[in-house]
């Protein structure tokens, strides 16, 4: 490192290293690239990040991320109200949308139940899910949770809460045990959604 004060650059590298998939070395390379491409990438990126910091918010209805209190998916009157797809986080919702197969509504839990991390039902959007099933005319809840231990524990808990109230299904073939939706290709997600099974 040169003798001049690079504290701002080092601070940016440290922040970038906190992003998923970036370690200290990749963050350093990314920051150096941003600096080299200041006008083309760094300045527009900084402007976009500033706008997102001001405008991004969680949809009050489903938990998706957007720039208004109710997201575009919830406002879309062409979507099927009877089907509600439950996912762990926004990345999973976006993965389902990329697959282009599901045309119903979504519900983002905001995580999974976890005894190790002391995350219980009240820490997630499970009470809101139960309320939506009761008030929105939902006929089927599709549990599109990751095939992890915490994901399956959460699915069983939700199934217990909604048992007898609504048809419950889960994604079938194509989602490997231990797999996460955000890492699957669109075809795999499509096949899994079409072959869902009742719980």
UniProtKB/Swiss-Prot annotation:
InterPro entries: DNA_Rcmb_RecR, Rcmb_RecR, TOPRIM_dom, TOPRIM_RecR. The keyword Phosphoprotein does not apply. CDD domains: TOPRIM_recR. A zinc finger (C4-type) spans 59-74. It holds the Pfam family RecR_HhH. PROSITE patterns: TOPRIM. GO terms for molecular function: DNA binding; zinc ion binding. Signal peptide: none annotated. SUPFAM superfamilies: Recombination protein RecR (SSF111304). Keywords: DNA damage, DNA recombination, DNA repair, Metal-binding, Zinc, Zinc-finger. Residues 82-176 form the Toprim domain. It comes from the Bacteria. One of its GO terms (biological process) is DNA repair. PANTHER family: RECOMBINATION PROTEIN RECR. Belongs to the RecR family. May play a role in DNA repair. It seems to be involved in an RecBC-independent recombinational process of DNA repair. It may act with RecF and RecO. This is Recombination protein RecR.
């Amino acid at each position: 490192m040169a003798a001049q004060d690079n504290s701002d650059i080092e601070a940016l590298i440290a922040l970038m290293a906190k992003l998923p998939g970036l370690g200290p070395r990749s963050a350093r390379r990314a920051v150096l690239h941003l600096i080299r491409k200041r006008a083309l990438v760094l300045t527009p990126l900084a402007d976009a990040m500033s706008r997102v910091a001001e405008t991004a918010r969680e949809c009050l209805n489903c938990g998706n991320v957007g720039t208004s209190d109710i997201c575009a998916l919830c406002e879309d009157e062409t979507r099927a109200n009877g089907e509600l797809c439950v996912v762990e986080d926004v990345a999973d919702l976006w993965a389902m949308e990329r697959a282009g197969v599901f045309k119903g509504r979504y519900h983002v839990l905001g995580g999974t139940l976890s005894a190790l991390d002391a995350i219980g039902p009240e820490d997630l959007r499970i009470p809101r899910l139960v309320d939506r099933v009761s008030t929105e005319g939902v006929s089927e809840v599709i549990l599109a949770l990751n095939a992890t231990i915490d994901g399956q524990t959460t699915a069983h808990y939700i199934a217990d809460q909604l048992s007898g109230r609504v048809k419950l299904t889960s994604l079938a073939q194509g989602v490997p045990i231990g797999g996460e939706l955000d890492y699957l290709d669109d075809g795999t997600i499509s096949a899994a959604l079409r072959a869902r099974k009742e719980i």
